Swiss-Prot record:
Protein name as annotated: High osmolarity signaling protein sho1
Organism the protein comes from: Talaromyces stipitatus (strain ATCC 10500 / CBS 375.48 / QM 6759 / NRRL 1006)
SH3 domain boundaries: 222-281
GO CC annotation: plasma membrane
PANTHER family: FCH AND DOUBLE SH3 DOMAINS PROTEIN, HIGH OSMOLARITY SIGNALING PROTEIN SHO1
UniProt similarity note: Belongs to the SHO1 family.
Source lineage: Eukaryota, Fungi, Dikarya, Ascomycota, Pezizomycotina
Topology within the bilayer: Multi-pass membrane protein
Amino acid sequence: MPRFDPSNILGDPFALSTISISIIAWIISFIGSIIADVQTDFPNYAWWAVAYMICVIAGIIVVVGSDTTLIYSNAVVGYLSAGLAFTTLAVNSLVYQPQSSKQAAAAGFILLSMINIIWIFYFGSTPESSHRQAIDSLALNKVGNAYHNSRPASNAFGARPATTVSQPPQMYTSAQLNGFETSSPMSGYPGGPPGSDKRNTTATNFPPANVEPSNEVSQPTEYPYKAKAIYSYDANPDDANEISFTKGEELEVSDVSGRWWQARRANGETGIAPSNYLILL
């Protein structure tokens, strides 16, 4: 479980403002509901909306504070959608009442409904969407490396395609292919026609190679693009080609096609990085 860090909220203007407004709105609806329940009949359904929304707000605080929005965004949108239904129904049952306490509670539920709509639009959008990139960019210069200990799930946008990274062709010697030669007298093979004295001298036609085929990815020489990390990423320890980086870090990128980009850090470390964790500058 990623570590909860209050600076993830305090350094993000969008998260700080929406969470603060939601807490104020919940307090208004809660106090208004208490007064209305004491003075007159109060719909029990509204109490469920009050209890449900405090749980949703607490969940948002935990998700944003631990920098796991990419992991739990689908669940968050589902809970917010249900909360929007509850708050709007509570508004409908209170806003038309003559008691000022009920109207105050309705005002709190209206604010909660507005915040729910904003959150659904934010958490329901992909990190590549323009409005979300604009919102996230506001926090980059303030938070810095506060998200260093978090690691969103890299499998969220699918496995890395094998064709997205170029790799030099592997050359094999005849010694490495020993055992694959055919013993049948077939013409057209480099060893010559059947009966030729060069038939079994295939191994001498190729110079021996002392270097084993490498699985390392070829490194480009130019990095014309610059990108900034909108999330922290920890490289897979089983994949030597991936690199780790922290939120707000600037990387040099050689190719922006595909879901994995060849990137270089400021310390000279090179490797591949998931494109949905980066934003081009």
